[in-house]
Amino acid sequence: MQRYFAHKRCCAMTAEVLADAGVQPTGNRLASWDLYIPSYGGGFSTEIADLLPSRSDQWVAGIPGSWRLTNKQMLWIGLCAAYGRQRAAQLSPESWWLEAARDRAALVEQHREGSHYILKNPILQRRTGLRLTQDLSVLLAGPEQGYTLAQRLLPELMLLHRHRFNLRLYLLLTRQDGRLEFWLHRRGRCVCAPAPFSGDLMDAEAVISRSVGSDVLADGLPFSLSEAVHHLPRPQITLARLDTVLCRVLMACRPGLQSAWCLSSNPAYQLLGVDVTISNTGGVRIIEMNAGPDLRPHCSRDHALKYRIVRDLFEHISLLPQTRPSGFRRLDVRAP
């Protein structure tokens, strides 16, 4: 790879990896680039559809239809359509689309006193787009404040040194020669809530995880995926369940991903961040997925991890020379 085109919002980590490899940016989207990085957002599918690549080996950093995974409402709707609501709730926390009359009616019917929920705003990122509540009236008024999804808060999650946590994984989607494939990186993060959990599901500091540097983690809390695995009572069984759950989620969305592609001759990839929870009994659920995941490092360890993931990505798809075995492993995702 010699040149790439990217919008100003290009991930800084991606730009750093490419600069270190001697790959030059170009401001001309009509130039003979080797990689095109779109502006991720609501219109990126249209942007890709309007591309006119001059060569069939030009890569595109975006897969139209990936919103079926990264849009929180659409992910839940896709799971329900593929498996039914009860089975879908075994793969991801039960959710209600607050802008849909049918889901609002179901929420009113299913709500019980003492139930806890987390409201999600699709526009605001990280903790600013989240709100904890037990109040049905707050749930129903959610869309007025931009909250479009209510997700059941899971009470019986595994704790690490009394802290709730989730695992942050990195999933690579590739489409080449008509094949859509899914690859999971062997490295990841353990993201913990700042405060110990005392049982109060309305305590945001103890319930909502926050990605921080290793230097400010509470004593004993793991930073990386590999460190977190050592705390699991049956790590191999839990990791196998993780693969199974992730594959089933991807199975449900694969048909839409297949049909949405608009550049038949050009290869494409997309990196997603996947947030996962583990229950006290070892059950695994996918909380959400994020497109163009936030790769801003929080410390030197975080920088090294994210730098390697991005470098491995480009080596995996042969845009950069391979310097070590790939950090990505293929997931066996078939039609549901």
Feature roles, as predicted:
Residues Y4-A12, G27, G62-T70, L75, ...:
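Intrinsic disorder
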Residues N290-H298:
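Glycine-rich phosphate/pyrophosphate-binding beta-alpha loops
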Residues R3-H116, I123-Q125, D135:
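Conserved N-proximal alpha/beta basic substrate-recognition cap immediately N-terminal to
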Residues W67, Y269-Q270, P293:
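Flexible, active-site-adjacent loop/turn segments at secondary-structure boundaries
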Residues E99, E113-S115, P122-L271, S279-I286, ...:
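Catalytic core of tubulin tyrosine ligase-like
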